[in-house]
UniProtKB/Swiss-Prot annotation:
The keyword Ion transport does not apply. The gene is alaS. Zn(2+) binds at residues 548, 552, 651, 655. Its EC number is 6.1.1.7. Its cofactor is Zn(2+). Binds 1 zinc ion per subunit. Belongs to the class-II aminoacyl-tRNA synthetase family. InterPro entries: aa-tRNA-synth_II/BPL/LPL (IPR045864), Ala-tRNA-lgiase_IIc (IPR002318), Ala-tRNA-ligase_IIc_anticod-bd (IPR018162), Ala-tRNA-synth_IIc_core (IPR018165), Ala-tRNA-synth_IIc_N (IPR018164), Ala-tRNA_ligase (IPR050058), Ala_tRNA_ligase_euk/bac (IPR023033), DHHA1_dom (IPR003156). This is Alanine--tRNA ligase. HAMAP family: Ala_tRNA_synth_B (MF_00036_B). Consists of three domains; the N-terminal catalytic domain, the editing domain and the C-terminal C-Ala domain. The editing domain removes incorrectly charged amino acids, while the C-Ala domain, along with tRNA(Ala), serves as a bridge to cooperatively bring together the editing and aminoacylation centers thus stimulating deacylation of misacylated tRNAs.
Length: 880
């Protein structure tokens, strides 16, 4: 039976028995305590907790789920996968154990035609009711096992109850049951009976007034049974993806265990990524987006392990969508966008994987037993390697990873980020003094409000008053001040009365519905409870509105130019300045940057009306409003429109009334901030005009310097560039001649030991002084001098030259002992010598027996490393 048929069969079975069919919720859970929807009951958790009414007393669903806790086991076992579909029927105070058990048994036997002698049941030891109902269904007593672990709870105070599980015997015949051999018996259905209420200590304190049923049956597992295959990867929704990967790679599934693991990883991770991107997730370096990035990057490595050198995501995602669209038809319309997101990640990480793998390989070849924490951090931070991927690659080579060192460096990086953040944003973790307080925000309509102080707080301490020179947090009944939120910087201004004056330096929201003003008391004495006047700096507010409205304009233009796949990844705006991050698979060209700025200013000059309305989230999204991914919205949302449908976004920030009030936008920077994420920075209003004036002044200075008119400038710069190119070439030619002439002089520095000429030295010590100052020496110069000396020497020699260049030690080694017979010949090869030398400098190198080169990181040890190597070589040549 096809998986799609199983899905429909299950829904139809329970629909005929009075259940309302509930569509699958998004994989992106609304529960902040979990990253993804990990169980069929999760969308109904508020109903089970009696915090929301259920959609119907009886519900049935097939829920998309993602679990990555066992991601390392994916591909290695027949049952582990990250994406799965959970079929479930639910009762909210309607039926209970008897009906749930009867429904389950009837579906398994009558609808799926499973052999009853292959089915086993487990119950909680104290749940005699469930045992009785299973026996009444015809399950033999010996196939009902009691397990104390069959008890479900939320893990905290709340509903709880016993559960009953149905297992399928994969082998058949006599056996010990699930308790005795868990690998032989596959759990297919779990029936949870919520009947108790537990306290925080886990003690049952009462029975629930309404008993509920929550069941879950894995669609992939039951498909595995009904299709008669040995693993979930052989079922009809995963096997086609796996076969496509096999076709691309030329690998045959079932022939090689390591290849089989990679094929399974590809099949699972591609399908999981397909469904996550379809639900709106995008790769990033934190939270849910990082999990998606891990899945995609593990897929890239799996493809490389299979020998796939070309990009393959386009083909694999198309196959996955073709298979999954039967159950999820919305995939067809989203496929182009999904492939664009996935292929971008594939392209960027393929390059990083090659560079990072080479770095990791050099570490592995240096006879070290482990990957250092520093190297792991560099791979993670610079090349984007997820740490689990680093440990996986290291494990394949028999190495471990210095995780303590890695996490120490990660913590230092996070501490630096937090320190930077704390300098720009007030972080209030202690909400003492604010409990129960609310403030009414009037700042959309008013910039000045007469109101009352409801609290004075300093460092978590409630004050009755504050004097001149104090910095204190003030809560008001009503406020016109906008708090830092949604990327918009807080308002500035003053809070004053006849008794004091306080300068508002920032505004924040420590609790939902509460605005707090951090004030420097400029004069007088402020007393809690007094009536004050709160006044926003109107010029600063207007300039902030210019930037925020311009951010929406830039967003709309970005989507016009780069497509709907270019979604907002972050923003920041303050008076005169905006920063906007968006997803894009490539670096925009110079002409596209110019076009972006021109389009934005054209929209500004079009005098587009700006309005805001309150509506439901459902209606806003249906009208085309952009809801930013990762933001949490209530049932009622504020929708800001610019030019009607041209720009519609859910936004609580402050805005202008007409686009023309922005005046002008100047795009001053466009850069990459992460893989697949671009950033534009713009100036707005007066700051933009000021920037234009500075640019004109700079152009005038360049014109005077070049002695050219504005029309002649480009040609003059080209001439200057060509002259510079010729000068560099002449300087390089002079340097080459100088080094060629310098090499014979260097021969005078050689010493003789056992008829072998030796020079092991820091080359920079011979290249100092005014004669050498015009030249900038490179690693290639060290190589060139070494090879020149090698050519000039007509006798046995050991030559190693090193120098510190840009903080790293670069070295080259030449050895010729062909005409002498020494017992140390095997040890004294250039390849061995360069490796021994650079290992002491935390570096690596290699080459041939007669010539080798490389680099090291620890420049401080250069002198001692040269002395030690020289002593070692002399000792070997002397027979010591």
């Amino acid at each position: 039976m096809l998986t799609s048929d199983l899905r429909l069969l299950f829904l139809d079975f329970f629909a005929k028995r009075g259940h309302k069919v509930s569509p699958s919720a998004s994989l992106i859970s609304n529960d902040p305590s979990v990253m993804f929807t990990i169980a069929g009951m999760l969308p109904f958790i508020q109903c089970f907790l009696a915090l929301e009414p259920p959609p119907h007393p009886r519900v049935v669903s097939v829920q998309k789920c993602i679990r990555t806790s066992d991601i390392d086991e994916v591909g290695k076992t027949p049952r582990h996968g990250t994406f799965f579909q959970m079929m479930g029927n639910f009762s909210f105070g309607d039926y209970f154990k008897k009906e749930a058990i009867e429904y389950a048994w009837e579906f398994l036997l009558s609808e799926l035609d499973l052999a009853p002698d292959r089915l086993w049941v487990t119950i909680h030891g104290d749940d005699k009711e469930s045992e009785k109902f299973w026996l009444l269904c015809g399950v033999p007593q010996e196939r009902v096992q009691s397990l104390d672990s069959n008890f479900w709870s939320t893990g905290k105070a709340g509903p709880a109850g016993p559960c009953s599980e149905v297992f399928y015997d994969l082998h058949g015949g006599p056996g010990p049951g699930p308790e005795g051999d868990p690998d032989r018996y596959l759990e297919v259905w779990n029936l949870v009976f919520m009947q108790n209420l537990r306290d925080n200590d886990g003690h049952i304190i009462s029975s629930l007034p309404k008993k509920c049923v929550d069941t879950g049956m894995g669609l992939e597992r039951i498909a595995m049974i009904t299709q008669g295959v040995g693993t979930i990867y052989d079922t009809d929704e995963l096997k086609p993806i796996l076969d496509e990967a096999g076709y691309i790679s030329g690998k045959r599934y079932g022939k090689d265990r390591r290849d089989d693991i990679s094929l399974r990883v590809l099949a699972d991770h591609i399908r999981s990524s397909l469904m996550l991107v379809a639900d709106g997730l995008r790769p990033s370096n934190e939270g849910r987006g990082y999990i998606l990035r891990r899945l995609l990057r593990r897929s890239v490595r799996a493809a490389k392990l299979l020998g796939i050198q070309e990009n393959c995501f386009d083909q694999l995602f198309a196959k996955a969508a073709q298979v999954m669209k039967v159950g999820y038809p919305e995939l067809e319309g989203k496929l182009a966008e999904i492939k664009q997101v996935a292929c971008l990640e594939e392209q960027s990480f393929s390059r990083a994987l090659n560079a990072g793998t080479q770095l990791l390989s050099r570490s592995m070849s240096s006879s070290k037993k482990r990957v250092s924490g520093d190297l792991a951090f560099r791979l993670h931070d610079t090349h984007g390697f997820p740490i689990d991927l680093i440990t996986e690659i290291a494990k394949d080579s028999g190495l471990d990873v210095d995780m303590d060192g890695f996490f120490t460096l990660m913590k230092e990086q996070k501490d630096r980020s937090r320190a930077a953040l704390s300098r720009s944003k007030p972080i209030v973790s202690d909400t003492t003094g604010y409990e129960g307080l609310r403030s009414n925000f009037l700042g959309y309509e008013m910039l000045q409000v007469d109101t009352k102080i409801t609290a004075l707080v300093k460092d978590g301490t409630i004050l009755t008053s504050a004097k001149q020179g104090d910095c204190v947090d003030i809560a008001l009944e009503q406020t016109p001040f906008y708090a830092t939120a949604g990327g918009q910087e807080a308002d500035r201004g003053f809070i004053e009365s006849d008794n004091f004056s306080g300068k508002v330096v920032t505004v924040f929201s420590p609790l939902p519905g509460l605005t707090v003003h951090r004030c420097e008391i400029v004069s007088g004495l402020v007393v809690s409870g007094e009536v004050v006047r709160a006044s926003v700096d109107s010029a600063n507010r207007f300039a902030a509105c210019q930037s925020h409205t311009a951010t929406h304009v830039i967003h709309a233009v970005v989507r016009e130019m780069f497509g709907s796949t270019s979604v907002q990844m972050g923003s920041y705006n303050r008076a005169g300045y905006l920063r906007f991050d968006f997803s894009c698979s490539y670096a925009p060209t110079d002409s596209q940057r110019i076009e972006l700025e021109e389009r934005a200013n054209r929209a500004i000059q079009s005098c587009l009306e700006i309005s805001s309305t309150y509506t439901t989230l459902e209606k806003a999204v249906a009208s085309g409003a952009i809801a930013l991914f990762g933001e949490r919205y209530g049932d009622t949302v504020r929708m800001v429109e610019i030019g009607g449908p041209w720009s519609r976004e859910l936004c609580a920030g402050t805005h202008l009334r007409n686009s023309s009030e922005i005046a002008v936008v100047s795009l001053v920077s466009e850069t990459s901030v992460a893989s697949g994420i671009r950033r534009v920075e713009c100036l707005t209003g007066f700051d933009a005009f000021s920037h234009f004036a500075q640019e004109r002044a700079l152009v005038d200075t360049v014109m005077r310097t070049l002695g050219a008119t504005r029309q002649e400038m480009e040609g003059a710069i080209d001439d200057l560039r060509e002259n510079l190119k010729r000068s560099k070439h002449a300087l390089q030619t002079a340097k080459d001649k100088f080094l060629s002439a310098f090499a014979p002089r260097l021969l005078q520095e050689f010493k003789s030991v056992s008829s072998v000429r030796i020079l092991i030295a820091d080359l920079s010590k011979f290249l100092s002084g005014p004669l050498f100052s015009p030249f900038e020496f490179t690693a290639e110069d060290i190589r060139a001098v070494t090879l020149r000396c090698k050519k000039l020497l007509e006798e046995p020699h050991v030559l190693l030259l090193a120098a510190v260049i840009s903080g790293r030690v670069h070295a080259a080694c030449s050895i010729d002992l062909s005409s002498v017979k020494l017992s140390c010949m095997d040890d004294l090869s250039a390849n061995n010598l360069i490796k021994v030398f650079l290992k002491t400098l935390d570096g690596s190198g290699g080459g041939r027996a007669d010539f080798a080169q490389g680099a090291g990181w620890n420049a401080k040890l250069l002198d001692s490393a040269l002395d030690n190597l020289k002593a070692c070589v002399i000792g070997k040549l002397s027979g010591v």
